[in-house]
Amino acid sequence: MTDSAQLFTGVHDTPVYTNVLFDKPLRIWVAVPAVVGSVTTILLAVLNLASGHALAILICGALLTAALTGIGALVPRTRPNIAFRLRAFTASVRPAVRTSYDTPILARPNLVDNLWFADNGSVYAGFLLSGLPYHLQSSRRKTAVADLHTLLGRELPADSWLYGLGVTQDQRQLLRAMVHGHRDRDDWLYSCAQVADQLADAEPKTRLYWLMVPVDAGRAGHNVVGQATKLKDWFAGRDKDSDSSLNAYIELAHDIANSLPPEFSPTPVTAAMSAWLWQHTTWLGTFTDPLPRPTAGGSITADQLPAAAFDEGDQQHKPRRPSIFNALPSWNKYVRVSATGPHSAIAPDSYQAVLPVVDAPEGGIVFPGSEFLAALDDLDTGAVFDFAINLTARPREMEFRRNDRARGNIDDQYDHRGDVRNGLTELRATERKIAEYNRLLSANIDEQPLSAAFFIHVGAADPRTLDHSIKRLREEMTQSGQIVIRHYRGANTRLWSAFNPGVAQHKSAVDQFAHATTASKWSRFVPLISSQLGNATGMLLGFNKGNANNSAVLLDLPGTARRNHNPCLICAGAPGYGKSYTSKKIVRAELQRGAQAFIVEPDEYGEWATALADVPNKAVIDMAGGDFGCDALRIFPERVAGSYWLDYMIPMLGLDVRSVAVGRLRTLLTPAARDALGLSSTAALMRYIRDIQAPLGAAEDTRSPQVTQLAEDLRPVLLALESWATYEFTQAIFDDTLPIPDLAALDVTIWQTGSLDLPDADEVANPHLYVALSDRQRASIAIYGMLVRLARVTFFNNTNRFGLIVLEEAGPLLNSRTGARDAHLISRRARKHYTGMLIITQNPIKDLALMGDEFITQQIIVPFEKEGIARAVAASAGLPLDEYPEFQDFFLAAAGAEEMRDPTAFDDDHPGPSKTTGSGSLQGRAFFIDEFRRLGAIQIAREPNEILHRAYDTTPDQGAA
């Protein structure tokens, strides 16, 4: 059965018709004035026949009856009612500036801790809620998120408010998060200071969720039961401001918070935060101060909050007209909010509009896909979009009786209305909705009937931006499930009070836009969702492109290990889209934060040496250059050096592991034998085996029988070693005069292995292919394997300093069984050894098959050129392709218009070399999977240091990527 979000709009508001007048169906507002007026007029005329005024009474009565009947015909058939519309019309025709001083619905609250004392005596408690991961998740996970909303809706007291606030991320707090734990690293502090301008240009934003629950009417809230509680307190003479009352409010708020699903992480706000909420909603779009950090206790009186003046229609700036028409109002459909009183400089004037949701599809909106409020984050118009949801729980039995009355009215209307104005169809539709509503309530005794009202608050710094934003909002709402919103002229000031908690529903007109629904159906709108990616601390990786908020994405690999998650990262994608650029940024950030890096670069290009040229404590080791040694007997600890030497050298030498020679060799390479015989290197081992061989010529052989036999057994080993020692690409193994880098003391070790040639997995797995491997390939297997194991052993032995192993162009290494085995071991054990691994690959499906990536969660995926690879990578990343066919927006490369222009347009080029990168409109874009398995598109942050940016770039003949 298809799940859906649904509002049972109008089930209790069926227009009433009657056919008492000439058996003609008329609305009650038309029939009553017509019947009463006609009868009254005729009766008065008859009674006054002798007075001489009968004709006048008849004429006036007929005119008055016609007028009242006409007015009755204008009464709206649906909510909002005539009273709301008349007040809005009056406010448009006779506008007046209303302030926080003289208008109760605009009054400022008194604040104590997380309590909000409204002007009318209502008391609310405020909590911050966490949005739940939802974007690009599977249907199963989305359903789980919606089910948590169901529990939330069932636990909230009546007349609770959920606010979704569009706020700017605190850039100062972002910088503090980046330097957290590393304030002693001057180079990292300087790097973060350079990022400040980048953050200011990006203006990252996020959505903040705020819950306000009434605590002055008991656990039930502001409904019939709650009103009875308030009446009892009134009879008892309870003082709302006493210490005992405050404690009772706080205890009730604590009880409500504990009843909510813990996934929402309800956190009590402070008085300073509540003051910020007042200012944010009052000067929406112009007040940009960040949310204050939590502080203990505190109170703020209403007089300490800035007061505001609400100019409906912005009469102060109404257009100039000829003098006779200058008294006419402006007729603008917005309100201008300005500061007044002693805090008049709090923020510039704000232009605002509040648009309620008035209708939704009758059959509901298919879930997933019903999260229409998420569309607010897709709008980038220069305005700020907030939303408010009022939830009023209704007693089940009262709701059943209410439905019965509505059903009875429908049955009656079948007789009175007939098919006037498509009446039969409308009545049947309403009857179906009531039946479905009753079915949902009856199916589950825990199902909670709700009255839900939705409001969207738009604020901007100027009217033009506001008007454009409202038009875009209407388009988004239409595309997000055919949600109908209305913009009422003259009602913005009154509707604004929906964002001032504590104002009675009939005062703020919230009751005019409430829709009957159930907790389970409301939950499918999933309003409390988040597209946040990354960590709370760490380096600036990029900006979230899952919506228009552009929120900052941080990456903290060492923190991942401390959180008991796997600090390994895969960076995959086609060449030229920024894999290496991103990896270099990550490595430099970790170096500046105190980590060590071990980089294997299978290329003679030397891009990593260029990128890290300014790092002082490093070693760049060219395996073909003869600068450093890579001998297992020298580079590994004594206790494991011999066994590791056997692991890599025996396959390279082509010896049978079950042979006598290898058995003898295994005995010689035990730690005790090596220490006794001085076998500290492969060259020393060769000298020892050579020395125990039979003397040349006629010299007397004085060897013991045991040594003679040992020499004979080891002769195949000596011959193989001497043969391999002649190659230039094996000198790192056989030349014991080459220095061994002190990896523990170095910050960076770059191993350039371009002179090596690793075979692929098939060549290693198939015996007939393996025997055909060249000596260079066999040596490459040994050297590559030793490098990866060396990094693992070195970093695993130091759990006090984070170590990062980087495998650039990791395909050749991971397609060898030895390299894949060690890389897999790192992926399983890196966490507890405080070690991370960064794998850079162009084809993760093929390159990681032998190694296995089941323990690696974090991935950065840049676009691919081939759709087949893109689809396979998307599926392996956990993106359900059947639910997100638009995956190509993230994974497939797209050329920019500049690159596909007509050749004759070359005259438009700027002088000098081309700056085109060939990566099209997706340059710098990536798909990121963080350690918590959240998925989303990001824009990789550009390196702010121009020198480093150029050093990272590998585009030929380009100054910038």
Predicted regions and their residues:
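Phosphate-binding P-loop/Walker A region and its immediate neighborhood
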Residues: 281-323, 328-332, 341-349, 479-568, ...
